[in-house]
Amino acid sequence: MSKLKQGTFITFEGGEGIGKSTQCQMLYEYLKSQNIPVILTREVGGTNVAEKMREILVHTDLLPMSELLQAMAARYDHMVKKIIPALQAGNIVICDRFIDSTACYQGLELENGIELVYNLHKDLMPPLMPDLTFFIDVESSIAIERINSRNMSNKFDVRGLDFYNKIYDCFKGLSKKFPERIVTIKASDLNPEQVHELIKKHLNLI
């Protein structure tokens, strides 16, 4: 029996260049083909206001706390206007990044920042966490090769190996901290179709 039920909130996490957005799209298209109500969204972004905040966040050098608060403000708008209404209507919601990305990208820049991110979410956001998170585990050296082949970039794309290793280690740590929620998909040696099949298998869709 499928693990999916109406109003399930699924997030995909990991560093840059790991094929995360591709997997979001593939799962979305598959669920649509099965006539399962589903929406696909992303963070930072997902609403008109949040997308404008995204442009500032990914293309502007901000102070670490300013960057964190920008991400949290965008999330509040996204949750209230899009994610929660979609879940209440019975949709599966697939989100490309959520709170774990904030912890790793913004939290790491602040003292006790990872704990701060989750505390802010608990205190300021509507009471919602993902039901399931897929961490797409791709080694940093492979991810950087993929990033370098891109035509477009933002400030996170152009940082060095040390940065990507820190992000990778952060996601690995979160997967151990939240094992009941985060499923690790080891994808360094797999093509997108193989990763997609593993995700479907975990969801009991095949």
From Swiss-Prot:
The keyword Iron-sulfur does not apply. It comes from the Bacteria. Its EC number is 2.7.4.9. It is an enzyme of class 2 (transferase). GO terms for cellular component: cytosol. Keywords: ATP-binding, Kinase, Nucleotide biosynthesis, Nucleotide-binding, Transferase. It catalyses: dTMP + ATP = dTDP + ADP. SUPFAM superfamilies: P-loop containing nucleoside triphosphate hydrolases. GO terms for molecular function: ATP binding; dTMP kinase activity. ATP binds at G14, G15, E16, G17, I18, G19, K20, S21. Pfam families: Thymidylate_kin (PF02223). Gene3D superfamilies: P-loop containing nucleotide triphosphate hydrolases. GO terms for biological process: dTDP biosynthetic process; dTTP biosynthetic process; dUDP biosynthetic process. Signal peptide: none annotated. Phosphorylation of dTMP to form dTDP in both de novo and salvage pathways of dTTP synthesis. Belongs to the thymidylate kinase family. This is Thymidylate kinase. The gene is tmk.
